[in-house]
Amino acid sequence: MRTRVKICGLTREQDIASAVRAGADAIGFVFYPASKRHVDPVRAAQLRREVPAFVDVVALFVNPRPDEVQAVLDHVAPDLLQFHGDETPQDCGRYGRRYLRAFRAGAPGLDSTAGLAAACRQYADAAGWLFDSYSAGYGGSGQGFDHGLLAGVQADPASRAIVLAGGLHPGNVADAVRAVRPWAVDVSSGVEDAPGVKSADKIRQLMAAIKSVDQVAR
């Protein structure tokens, strides 16, 4: 199976071009004002024009108001929504769009295999479950987590697509993919020179590392 790749937190046209050239399957825009990678709907709409056919655009939110999501839907027309806050299943599903639900593995209640699997099952209509590390704030922490916590999710026959995040970079992504065999990985700070400024070299290195694992697994 080929591991899909999403490069998240894009803020510049040249970084979209780098991700696309390297073979990324999706790019992500962050609509969380507290993030250093935040873009507003108007800017995201400009960036979206640089994304070619067959590369998905993902819109990331943290506890948004419905009107904030609607503004992104109207301006950007994302292919997928991604919720990283305390959104309920009803919050995520109210827009009638495909969505990813993020879980901060290791957070209170999500610090055991059973607890994490139980939380995931509440979002059975999600297009995928994304697993990031726990930190005090919202959004990506840039840190890894114990992948053993995913055992209950991996054993669940009703599991949705597993998207692995949390501190991934060119130097560790191969081991992470080999251990978890996720449907996809989601990377942001691990391919940056500065917050919101991606490195074309790091993106290429990341993609090459993932491809090397996928080729062996065939």
Swiss-Prot record:
CDD domains: PRAI. Pfam families: PRAI. Its EC number is 5.3.1.24. Belongs to the TrpF family. One of its GO terms (biological process) is L-tryptophan biosynthetic process. One of its GO terms (molecular function) is phosphoribosylanthranilate isomerase activity. Pathway: Amino-acid biosynthesis; L-tryptophan biosynthesis; L-tryptophan from chorismate: step 3/5. It comes from Bordetella parapertussis (strain 12822 / ATCC BAA-587 / NCTC 13253). The gene is trpF. Coiled coil: none annotated. This is N-(5'-phosphoribosyl)anthranilate isomerase. Keywords: Amino-acid biosynthesis, Aromatic amino acid biosynthesis, Isomerase, Tryptophan biosynthesis. Disulfide bonds: none annotated. It catalyses: N-(5-phospho-beta-D-ribosyl)anthranilate = 1-(2-carboxyphenylamino)-1-deoxy-D-ribulose 5-phosphate.
